[in-house]
Amino acid sequence: MEKILVINPGSTSTKIAVYEDDRQLFVNSIEHADEEIEKYDAIYDQYEFRKKLVLEELEKNGVKASELTCVMSRGGLLPPVPAGAIRVNQDMCDQLRLHPVNEHASNLGAPIAFSIAEENDIPAFIYDPVTVDEMIQLAKYTGIPEMRRRSLGHNLNMRAMAHRYAADSGKKFEDVTVITVHMGGGTTVGVYQNGKIIDIINDEEGPFSPERAGGLPAPQVIDIAFSGEYDIKALKKKL
């Protein structure tokens, strides 16, 4: 029997669940107040804080870390990777700590999972991280030769929903074409065809959402950038 800890660190919450095979033992979402998160200068500074919450949640629900057989986590902003499960190692954790593609709370997932797994001599995995890249080349072109669109999105949720749609329709995942939309702190839109996400509108170029400005008129962005009111860090935070 497998006992699996699942961790999903998001911008405003840390979601935790434990499964015995496919039976859910418990699930909880710990919401983080703005003033709590704003104590930390960098996202990775939240590592100890969030790991402590995960371990406390296990204890609260009567689950010993030593009983676990695997730790699964939401993946962070790694370089482009294929869809599916990827085993976590120290190199991955170092990449997310020192050279993430972008700053996001999901970068904490693999290091927390790896730490708990190492302490209990079990494997840790991430699944469908936000940097899954299966986009066709045509979808990466923009109106400026020096710029290319990037494959970034909420793949964990969108791919799961595409799989669920296929199953509910009595079809194979590889045989459906489906548009998926993730609506959370950021909104991403993807299209799946033949089992791959061939195009994606990430949360910085599509609809605005509670934590993202979304696609904006380029001339106005340029005006704000050169207004002298913002440095690059402040402007990125505003967007």
How would you describe each model-predicted region?
Residues 2-7, 67-72, 178-182:
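Short glycine-aspartate micro-motif
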Residues 27-66, 92, 96-101:
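N-terminal phosphate-binding loop and adjacent alpha-helix
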Residues 70-73, 123-129, 179-181, 191, ...:
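General beta-strand structural signal in soluble alpha/beta enzymes
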